């Protein structure tokens, strides 16, 4: 039987100004869908897998073809409905409505488990969309680099007086998300030892300059770390091995990294985490033949892995969960103190979320890197006092290789996002940019996610699991005129542990686009300030007052 999810073909987004669709409002989602499956972007594009275990862009190749065909004929007064990667309907709406509405892997809470999802998945009734895979705004590993960089910089401020020179970070996983860690560490001034079981991933990170060296043994990797830290150099090494073996071995040897984290795809025990003692080939085969055996072995390995992280924490090493739900699995497997160390959001990122600051991103539909460099310059011009951001943009230009369509990630917040969006739109109108840009973000943002073991862990008022907020965020983005809006379940941390929404808006240089951009790029981050103000965070309350937000049940205005 032919696998409907496997097809040996290369997909790449069109570039330039010639349209395949009826307008830029439908050309934009078409190109970004294709960009998600570019061989330089996606992890397993022939299987429709973009990143994060089995995060897909479309349910089957037949569905992909139908989405493409529909987008090419969709008018500016129609909206395409996509249900878990399948184009199920086209409806008459209006010009300011989203052109595409997407819902991925959403399940009624009682049934929101991997077992139930996998059953639906096998029947062809569902698709795991991760966060930006099924919402068509993945830009490669750059998409998470700045967030990781901000985390490491803040950890350096809190624990090492703001100086990571001569320090090293231990982590695991070099997939679509984890691959950001070594480069982010180096940008923050630290060395990094990243453990990865799949050599092809290490090689890919070497090729795209996200990692500096490769090692086959722990001793070889440690020798490089020792050499670099003593010389005060910031460099990274990808060690081919299993984190469930390497982390405990380092504990056994009494070796103390300066920061410990992990970004293996532990959120998906079957497809995302190699059990200790298994080869990659054996693992891939048993995912099909005996998935339950894989799950049992992977979960047992995660317990060992997290136990080692707790050991590092108890040694006084700053240790953080980077949002893959590995602590939850370890606790379910009997490790009572699995949550001894914190997640990265409550430890380092929440003050940014309180001001609506998060992973704003844009991609140049022209395909020309110069369009991105021009927008980089515009960001500096409009935000002249944000030297930290200027430093990031300079490092990004120097170190980050574009994957697929040229793109940029840039953490900015309420009051700045709409300003940048309007400026980019004017650059398209004037011809300074060769073609329109799309502006979006990760679902990991201040007002668009409920994830009690990650973004909303340890909320001040105990509202960690309240998922009204991402639903309201999606609804408001629809009402505001985003070009496409998505609502997903299970991204980052797996089934049953998160709900989250995304939006993308196209800046095509028109007056209509300007009006939509101003609404969307103000309202979207404002929901994050609202959510954190409602939880009682003073930073968010002050920001809401400063920006003049009308929050009757919170500010009484």
From Swiss-Prot:
E.C. number(s) listed in UniProt: 4.2.1.49
A GO biological-process term: L-histidine catabolic process to glutamate and formate
Task of the protein: Catalyzes the conversion of urocanate to 4-imidazolone-5-propionate.
Group of enzyme by EC: lyase
Keyword Ligase: no
Organism from which the protein derives: Allorhizobium ampelinum (strain ATCC BAA-846 / DSM 112012 / S4) (Agrobacterium vitis (strain S4))
Record keywords, A-Z: Cytoplasm, Histidine metabolism, Lyase, NAD
A Gene Ontology term for the protein's cellular component: cytoplasm
Gene3D superfamilies reported for this sequence: Urocanase like domains, Urocanase superfamily
Family note: Belongs to the urocanase family.
Compartments (UniProt record): Cytoplasm
Binding residue positions for NAD(+): 52-53, 130, 176-178, 196, 201, 242-243, 263-267, 273-274, 322, 492
Name of this protein: Urocanate hydratase
InterPro entries on file: Urocanase (IPR055351), Urocanase-like (IPR023637), Urocanase_C (IPR035401), Urocanase_central_sf (IPR038364), Urocanase_CS (IPR023636), Urocanase_N (IPR035400), Urocanase_Rossmann-like (IPR035085), Urocanase_sf (IPR036190)
Textual note on the cofactor: Binds 1 NAD(+) per subunit.
Catalysed transformations (reactions): 4-imidazolone-5-propanoate = trans-urocanate + H2O
Co-factor requirement: NAD(+)
Zinc among keywords: no
Active site: 410
């Amino acid at each position: 039987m032919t696998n409907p999810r496997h097809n040996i073909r290369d997909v790449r987004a069109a570039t330039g100004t010639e349209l395949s669709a009826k307008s830029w409002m439908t050309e934009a989602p078409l190109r970004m869908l294709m960009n998600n499956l570019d061989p330089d972007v996606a992890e397993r594009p022939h299987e429709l897998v973009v990143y994060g275990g089995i995060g897909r862009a479309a349910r089957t190749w037949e569905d992909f073809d139908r989405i493409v065909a529909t987008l090419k004929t969709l008018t500016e007064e129609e909206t395409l409905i996509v249900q878990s990667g399948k184009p199920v309907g086209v409806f008459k709406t209006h010009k300011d409505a989203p052109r595409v509405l997407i819902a991925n892997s959403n399940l009624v809470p009682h049934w929101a488990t991997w077992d139930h999802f996998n059953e639906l998945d096998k029947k062809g009734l569902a698709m795991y969309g991760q966060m930006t895979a099924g919402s068509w705004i993945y830009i490669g590993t750059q998409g998470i680099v700045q967030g990781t960089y901000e985390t490491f910089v803040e950890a350096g401020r809190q624990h090492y007086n703001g100086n990571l020179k001569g320090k090293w970070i231990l982590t695991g996983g070099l997939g679509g998300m984890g691959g950001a860690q070594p480069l982010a560490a180096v940008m923050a001034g630290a060395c990094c030892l990243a453990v990865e079981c799949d050599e092809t991933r290490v090689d890919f990170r070497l090729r795209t300059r996200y990692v500096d060296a490769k090692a086959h043994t722990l001793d070889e990797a440690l020798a490089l770390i020792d050499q670099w830290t003593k010389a005060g150099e910031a460099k990274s090494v990808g060690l081919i091995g299993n984190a469930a073996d390497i982390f405990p071995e380092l504990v056994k040897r009494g070796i103390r990294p300066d920061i410990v984290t992990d970004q293996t795809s532990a959120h998906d025990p079957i497809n995302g985490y190699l059990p200790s003692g298994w080869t990659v080939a054996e693992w891939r085969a048993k995912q099909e033949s005996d998935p339950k055996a894989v799950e049992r072995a992977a979960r047992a390995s995660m317990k060992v892995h997290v136990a080692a992280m707790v050991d590092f924490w108890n040694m006084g090493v700053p240790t953080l969960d980077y949002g893959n739900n590995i602590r939850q699995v370890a606790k379910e497997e009997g490790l009572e103190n699995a949550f001894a160390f914190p997640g990265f959001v409550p430890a380092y990122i929440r003050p940014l979320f309180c001001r609506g600051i998060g992973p704003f991103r844009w991609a140049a539909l022209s395909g020309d890197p110069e369009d991105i460099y021009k927008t980089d310059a515009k960001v500096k011009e409009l935000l002249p006092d944000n030297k930290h951001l200027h430093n990031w943009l300079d490092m990004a230009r120097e170190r980050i290789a574009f994957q697929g369509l040229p793109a940029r990630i840039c953490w900015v917040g309420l009051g700045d996002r709409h300003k940048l969006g309007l400026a980019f739109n004017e650059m398209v109108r004037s011809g300074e940019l060769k073609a329109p840009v799309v502006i979006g973000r990760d679902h990991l943002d201040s007002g668009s996610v409920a994830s009690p073991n990650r973004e909303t862990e340890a909320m001040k008022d105990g509202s960690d699991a309240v998922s009204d907020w991402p639903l309201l965020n999606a609804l408001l983005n629809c009402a505001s005129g985003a070009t496409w809006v998505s609502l997903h379940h299970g991204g980052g941390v797996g089934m049953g542990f998160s709900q989250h929404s995304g939006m993308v808006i196209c800046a095509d240089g028109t007056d209509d686009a300007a009006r939509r951009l101003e609404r969307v790029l103000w309202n979207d981050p404002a929901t994050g300030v609202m959510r954190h103000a409602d939880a009682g965070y003073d930073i968010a309350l002050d920001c809401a007052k400063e920006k003049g937000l009308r929050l009757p049940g919170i500010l009484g205005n």
